């Protein structure tokens, strides 16, 4: 049976991290973390908006994706982050996967030098070593994709991130994954409307899964396929979700995007 895209990405990532661990010492990462004064509480920023009955947008920064190909040819992550900041987004999500999304961890470091917004390291976490690695570059949050990890690895990633005072975002696409994610009490849970195995998007995924998660203690997020302000408001009005992770729809129309007006 042919590998799906998620399996291909994870296979490549495992190889990369194994090689990186041979040349990068954990002590070095911890030194960088201790020197870095840029950290911001990702979850707290979103929770404050919820408490104040405000919507939150986690705006994504990426050059490319397997589904869309090259999104931005002349890619300047810091410039994009600055535009987002001017439009008062709540947090940033920065793609750092190198082979399929053409990202890099250094993009987080460069953005953090200029802009004071919490940043999610959007990547495929396959080893707990990646958690201090992300934090050493200035990341405030990590992603656990339930479709791409074992139960043991999910637990390890969660515990490592909590130990390092990072926000954990757990991504789900099915009811079964949503049920599994509920045990991560302090995590934010994001419903991904895109099936990472087929890359097909259906915004109804959020409605289908929401009921399973509505009693979760942390904030809920919807991501993928949200193209208009009207779609965002429909999701907000019909569910308890008040936080939205949006990438391509913003990146393709950065200057005058009506989605920013919900903030």
Predicted segments — roles?
Residues 133-153, 190-199, 239-260:
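Glycine-rich phosphate-binding active-site loops on the catalytic face of alpha/beta enzymes
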Residues 12, 60-64, 97, 124, ...:
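Active-site beta-loop-alpha junctions enriched in small/polar residues
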Residues 57-61, 92-94, 119-122, 142-144, ...:
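Hydrophobic faces of well-ordered beta-strands that scaffold small-molecule active sites
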Residues 126-138, 173-185, 216-246, 258-262:
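Catalytic cores of alpha/beta
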Residues 9, 59, 84, 92, ...:
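Conserved, mostly hydrophobic/aromatic
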Residues 67-169, 177-180, 206-209:
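N-terminal active-site wall of soluble small-molecule enzyme domains
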Residues 13, 203-213, 250-263:
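C-terminal helical cap(s) of enzyme catalytic domains, especially alpha/beta-barrels
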Residues 1-62, 67:
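N-terminal amphipathic alpha-helix/helix-capping segment at the start of soluble metabolic enzymes
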């Amino acid at each position: 049976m042919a590998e799906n895209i998620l399996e291909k990405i994870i296979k490549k990532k495992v190889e990369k991290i194994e090689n990186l661990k041979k040349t990068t010492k954990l002590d070095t990462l911890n030194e960088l973390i201790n020197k870095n004064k840029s950290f911001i509480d990702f979850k707290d920023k979103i929770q404050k908006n919820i408490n104040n009955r405000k919507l939150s947008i986690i705006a994504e920064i990426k050059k490319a994706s397997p589904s869309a190909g090259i999104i931005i040819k002349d890619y300047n992550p810091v410039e994009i982050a600055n535009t987002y900041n001017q439009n008062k987004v709540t947090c940033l999500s920065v793609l750092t996967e190198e082979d399929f999304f053409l990202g890099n961890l250094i993009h987080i470091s460069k953005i953090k030098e200029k802009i004071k917004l919490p940043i999610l390291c959007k990547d495929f976490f396959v080893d707990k070593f990646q958690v201090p690695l992300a934090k050493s570059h200035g990341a405030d949050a990590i992603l656990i994709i339930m479709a791409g990890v074992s139960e043991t690895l999910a637990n390890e990633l969660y515990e490592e991130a909590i130990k390092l005072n990072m926000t954990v975002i757990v991504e789900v696409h099915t009811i079964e994954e949503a049920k599994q994610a509920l045990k991560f009490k302090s995590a934010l849970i994001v419903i991904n409307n895109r099936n990472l195995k087929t890359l097909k998007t259906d915004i109804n995924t959020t409605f289908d899964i929401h009921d399973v998660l509505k009693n979760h203690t942390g904030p809920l997020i919807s991501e993928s396929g949200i193209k208009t302000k009207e779609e965002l408001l429909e999701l907000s009005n019909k569910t308890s979700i008040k936080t939205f992770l949006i990438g391509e729809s913003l990146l393709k129309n950065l200057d005058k995007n009506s989605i920013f007006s919900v903030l």
